[in-house]
Amino acid sequence: MNPNYLDFEQPIADLEAKIQELRNASAGPAVNVEAEVHALQDKLRMRTAQIFRNLTSWQVLQLARHPSRPYTADYLRVMFDEFQELAGDRAFADDKAIMGGLARINGRAVMVIGHQKGRDTKEKIKRNFGMPKPEGYRKALRLMKMAERFGLPVLTLIDTAGAWPGIDAESRGQSEAIARNLIEMAELKVPIICTVIGEGGSGGALALGVGDRTVMLEYAVYSTITPEGCASILWKDAGKAKDAAEQLGLTAPRLKSLGLVDKVVREPTGGAHRNPTQMAKRLKAVLLNELDALDKLSTEQLLEQRYARLRSYGTYEAA
């Protein structure tokens, strides 16, 4: 099976292989298979739509983790006119799991900050698999405070399995760094738009996730823990991760129905990795619309609405 296809995409892979075989055959003399190719292409479109209409939470998670899914760096290349990366937390080190800096989107100056995973083994190690340490979150906060000083909106791109849980991170105050970001982002005097582009794992994601708007890509996920971790804790069996994924309610439509996500951005057929450029253009349009809406608010209105938004989470009515 083509490694770019997930298990549940096997019927799609088979049809695409047949189409390719026919195209190769048509290269010979006096062979015309266009009618058959068109018929298979129609069948492929219908089968793909059918599969992606009925995805389970576990299958959505596999798409969110797809090795070819666009990362922060990929969106930076397509969505922004300019990007100047800024490094370091000015206290300990530069954490490569977080990248951020000054950018322009349609000529508008913004501060962009996001998790960054790696493609190959070398880059994965360099980026620590997209799992930040305290210095990463402190770098992010430094850039947010800089944005506040210059009156720049903050755009965050969330894609992490979680904060790094190593002893080195704990000894440098991992929990404090995350908590500090939550406090400071709640009070930052500039617009903040948070977008979950892949995995949104626990506090490691939330440390870039407090803002005025939360946007989520169609096949991204957002939860307090990974399904594997949840299954290990609840049932002492990581093999029950599929069941945990359903119970966690980690998909974009589910979170939007709960009021935790403001907008879900539709992905290209087959997921963002099938057409990263189209995905980036769709997300760019959404972010520009949200920036325009937030620009109309005064600082006082912005903070009041953000406070009310945060206070609304977790409310319930007694029976």
From Swiss-Prot:
Pfam families linked: ACCA (PF03255)
Pathway: Lipid metabolism; malonyl-CoA biosynthesis; malonyl-CoA from acetyl-CoA: step 1/1
Record EC number: 2.1.3.15
InterPro entries: Acetyl_CoA_COase_a_su, ClpP/crotonase-like_dom_sf, COA_CT_C
GO BP term, pick one: fatty acid biosynthetic process
Top-level class of the enzyme under EC nomenclature: transferase
GO molecular function term, any single one: carboxyl- or carbamoyltransferase activity
Catalysed reaction equations from the record: N(6)-carboxybiotinyl-L-lysyl-[protein] + acetyl-CoA = N(6)-biotinyl-L-lysyl-[protein] + malonyl-CoA
Keywords, sorted A to Z: ATP-binding, Cytoplasm, Fatty acid biosynthesis, Fatty acid metabolism, Lipid biosynthesis, Lipid metabolism, Nucleotide-binding, Transferase
Chief location bin: cytoplasm
GO cellular component, one term: acetyl-CoA carboxylase complex
Compartments it resides in: Cytoplasm
Residue intervals of the CoA carboxyltransferase C-terminal domain: 38-293
Domain of life: Bacteria
Function field: Component of the acetyl coenzyme A carboxylase (ACC) complex. First, biotin carboxylase catalyzes the carboxylation of biotin on its carrier protein (BCCP) and then the CO(2) group is transferred by the carboxyltransferase to acetyl-CoA to form malonyl-CoA.
HAMAP family per UniProt: AcetylCoA_CT_alpha
Quaternary structure and partners: Acetyl-CoA carboxylase is a heterohexamer composed of biotin carboxyl carrier protein (AccB), biotin carboxylase (AccC) and two subunits each of ACCase subunit alpha (AccA) and ACCase subunit beta (AccD).
Family the entry assigns: Belongs to the AccA family.
Name under which the protein is recorded: Acetyl-coenzyme A carboxylase carboxyl transferase subunit alpha
Organism: Stenotrophomonas maltophilia (strain K279a)
Lineage, opening ranks: Bacteria, Pseudomonadati, Pseudomonadota, Gammaproteobacteria, Lysobacterales
